Amino acid sequence: MTQYINGQWFAGLGHQVSSINPATGQSIWNGVTATADQVNQAVDAARAAQFDWFMLGFEARLSIVEAYRSELEANKAQLAEVIAQETGKPQWETATEVGAMIGKIALSAAAHDKRTGTETNELAAGRAVLRHKPHGVVAVFGPYNFPGHLPNGHIVPALLAGNTVVFKPSELTPKVAEEMLKLWDKAGLPKGVINLVQGEVETGKALASHPQIDGLFFTGSSRTGHILHQQYAGHPGKILALEMGGNNPLIVKGVSDTKAAVHDIIQSAYISSGQRCTCARRLYIEQGAAGDELIAQLITAVNNIQVGAWNSQPQPFMGSMISETAARGMVAAQATLQALGGVSLVELAQVEAGTGLVSPGLIDVTQIAELPDEEYFGPLLQLVRYTDFDEAIRLANATRYGLSAGLLADNRDDYDYFLARIRAGIVNWNKQITGASGAAPFGGVGASGNHRASAFYAADYCAYPVASMEADSVSMPASLSPGLSI
């Protein structure tokens, strides 16, 4: 039973699909995709449930969402294990993902109040009131890299605002989505408020193009996001929130603590096997002896990164990539850069055939005149040596993306200079660029998004403002407008 529609589990009526543990190549979940008719049923169920869900009021909705938080807390070990098996990420990392899902509840409640709450201003003859209303039925498209946390970051604020949801997870992580919906069901969510449709491209297209959805919240590749943006052209009445990738730069300038810099570089480039949209893809290090020493230490540290299966003991830093196909894609990306003149300082390689396990790579691309502006979504870091800080910033900005960027530097003036000139939605100083606060907005510019920042600002795209002028009774003004006689 792979589809959850109107509070009931159904088998899909499409074709057979399975989910593979990428560290072993073994199937861990099997199901049948949703057809366009089942997608239609899910949207109809969400539509039928929406007004009553909204009319429950915020406190009642929050109470049910809090019950979901309790279910997450009670089942966190089991959910973390499912995420680890299906994504290949190490157990320590998936435990932090479930922790982020739990923390999202309080953050979303606070954001709802701060970003989209109710505000009243008393006037001489009445009052001005600002309220917010839900859009209605929204589709949530989830990614595979954080299959619990990232869709959760759309679903929770959407529900708190009074929307109902049709959730289409990544076809690579269906088991995680199924486990999430079981917890929502146990939390007592009314029928139709969340509906799950599992499937591949055909299922996604049926949902994205459905005339009865009022919005779509997407986390995933820039390519798919741009297709959705084109599809929604001419539909100004629908809200579209796109959270996409990046070709993210990290610049190092004048750092005295080389060991700490190496640590932040590794955390920026190789965490989650490089499968975070905020991961550093390009590293800029000054020419000279200090830069040479930093690179030497970085090479040693990258070679020492432990890679292993999700359940390996001791636990590895890097687990598997999402699939063998993804692993082969990174090997091919490295070969492309080498053919253009890149020199591998640490060779990325597939660790075991038939799996998504790869070792991390570091490649010097300084001599490549036209560096491809691509998001290589894996553990491959491109190194560029520079002599001039302005030139490093110019190169860092030479991308159509604009998600995250960072500077490792002892001098605050250097950071202020960098901050004023860099083009990105997340800009960190002396911190890994994969680090982001849930109490802040999360999003980028350019090909990284469409100005609908998520995280704390997700509340903004989950509701629309309603401005009212109100009085308790009708009354005559002190004087009539010219030309009136009543």
Curated annotation (Swiss-Prot):
Gene Ontology terms for molecular function: succinylglutamate-semialdehyde dehydrogenase activity
Record PROSITE patterns: ALDEHYDE_DEHYDR_CYS, ALDEHYDE_DEHYDR_GLU
One GO process term, biological-process aspect: arginine catabolic process to succinate
Superkingdom of the organism of origin: Bacteria
Gene3D superfamilies assigned: Aldehyde Dehydrogenase, Chain A, domain 1 (3.40.605.10), Aldehyde Dehydrogenase, Chain A, domain 2 (3.40.309.10)
Residues reported to bind NAD(+): G220, S221, S222, R223, T224, G225
Record: active site: E243, C277
Keywords in alphabetical order: Arginine metabolism, NAD, Oxidoreductase
Functional pathway: Amino-acid degradation; L-arginine degradation via AST pathway; L-glutamate and succinate from L-arginine: step 4/5
The family this protein is said to belong to: Belongs to the aldehyde dehydrogenase family. AstD subfamily.
Name of protein: N-succinylglutamate 5-semialdehyde dehydrogenase 2
Gene expressing this chain: astD2
